Amino acid sequence: MQDDGGTKMNDIKLKHILPQTGEIVVGCMRFDSLTPEQIADMIDRLAGEGILHYDHADIYGNGICEEKFGQALQLCQTPREQLILQSKCGIREGYYDLSREYILDAVDRILARLQTGYLDLLILHRPDALMEPSEIAAAFDELQAAGKVRYFGVSNFTPGQIELLESAVHQPLLVNQLQLSIPNSWMMSSGLETNMPTEGSIDRDGHVLDSMQAKGITIQTWSPLQFGDWEGTFLDHPEFPELNRLLEKLAEKYGVSKSAIAAAWILRHPAGMQVVTGSSKTERILDMAKARNLHLTRKEWYALYQAAGHRIP
């Protein structure tokens, strides 16, 4: 890869298995506000730009997001086989449940709502303190044998939890969804501030970034424009004046929006990550997708990191 000023993007390991995927994954959490007709139009427009990967979860809109998407699949011109559909399960009201019975039932319900015979990826939404790897392995085997799920992954799992799961399951875990944005980049701070008596040096996730990169598990980044604990977007937020000034400067330089620069910052990392969008508006998704053609310089990447308030020892 070119060190500075180039346009070559990093290798996304998931693309070796699912060739239709790319740097952008369309998050469907807010699709309950759309009509099936609007979603169908979005699917076709994004397909024309090479964006074919959609992220669902059974809890999004209490299932309404998947239901409307399933209706849209019957209306759009893009064949189901061209799309990558992934969904997540395991979060119930007030507790987590990764039991065999719940996983199997959740997938059946997801498939019914999406009006499809299979998921390209099933992702375990969050770790369950009571999870038994042998139960999960049995569920995975049944789902794959029945043709209901092609591949599997996790979300918000530590390397240790992945190792525990891998001790029983027979399928490779292809993805780990993790929160990452320029301000919310603790997984990078702990590595950069190693051996320092600083807040940023604290390892909160078992060095998940290094581990996923070493294992070839693709990180899908959620909330790429958010900061704090669901406090909102950092774009144009008064708490981040220096960051927004630099984003504006780089946006002008590259002829894109600030959101595209924020996504390009994530895509610049050699781990080969994917950005999960959070918008229900086609234009905003296409706008962020311009990050696919950007390659920030090393100096620009570190400048954005520091502008968000992070420390370089």
Language-model-derived ranges and their functions:
Residues 34-46, 98-114, 160-163:
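Short, acidic/polar
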